[in-house]
Amino acid sequence: MAEIDMTKPQPCTKFRDADTVEWIAKLMEETNEAIQEAENYEMICKNAAAGTGDVLDAKDRLAEELTDVITVCVSWLDALGYDEAKRGELNRRVNEKNEKRGYF
């Protein structure tokens, strides 16, 4: 078995057999956690000097929750049969579409 690159999103197989409603629930759960951390981050930024420990901690928590959302999406794609190569192709297509739209 190949070594897992822990610096890239890896699909979690625990929910591989989940039905659509369960996937949606998991995605909503993780998205709600990201929303809560985003609100917390905004509040802390408004009330603290930039670069303080509180701001940096809140930023890290938000980043981790956003990464959890990415991981759920990668896991769901994996469960749908999109391995890393197929997910890479999807990313390329979406990036090309976004480039044409002038998003970057």
PLM-predicted stretches and their roles:
Residues M1-F104:
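Flexible "arm" and connector segments at domain edges
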